[in-house]
Amino acid sequence: MASLFLAPDLAAFADTLPILQLRYSADTGANIVAVGQYASRQDYVSDNLAGSRMRVQIPGLPERSNLADFQVDTNGDVLFALDIGVSLGGTYFYPADVIKYSGGTFSKAFDAVAAGVPKGVHCDGVARLDTNSKLLLSFDRTFAANGFTVRPADVMLITAGAFSAKKLDAQALGFSSALNIVGIDAMGTHTDLLVAFDSAGTVGGVTFTRNDLLSVHLPSGVWTKRYALSSFSDRWNTAHVDGVAALNDTLFKDGFE
């Protein structure tokens, strides 16, 4: 069956923050770049939202690994998590670590063991506050660290390598305990988040499916469905989003400049 690619209806997903470029990854290899153009589960796709998509590879990742969520810094460095423990460049990284790829070398941007994250936990949300500021992270199961109970739909602020605050508090917002965040991006702001979940659900009165991307304006608590990846390609009927990053027009980063 031929793959059907559709241009997203941007007007249908309009919001206060203009996104100039969207990056996303899937949990399985699929032709999500274009018809007959494959991206593996170690890759991500860079999409200009005008019909042009490009496969991006992080060199050196083992074929058996899956790229979870990721953050692309303005200098081109990539911060990301993997679904398995791996040795890269002589350093061992746990699934809850955040790996930094910069100039051909790998290092730890977040040390899960030092932060008190138990073994068996996976990091599945990686972003930065504002553009190149503090890390925002999410994890796949509930655990306690540094005085916080961290839940799968929480977004945690990291200060000096430790959990310091909840940027998104799932319990306080009344989220279903079944919800798990698998992708986040702050869109170059300290006020907004782009979010992907690993299942369908409802948040803030907005009902969504597995491959929808939502945004939330944190000061007002208003949620909006921004993108339905199923409208980008029919391959999203079998592939599932597990990483998002966005390039925002920083002129409007607070939504009112």
Question: Which stretches of residues belong to each language-model region?
Answer:
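Non-transmembrane domains of secretory- and envelope-associated proteins
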Residues: 251-253
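Bacterial N-terminal signal peptides
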Residues: 1-9
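Sequence/structural signature of beta-propeller domains
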Residues: 13-249
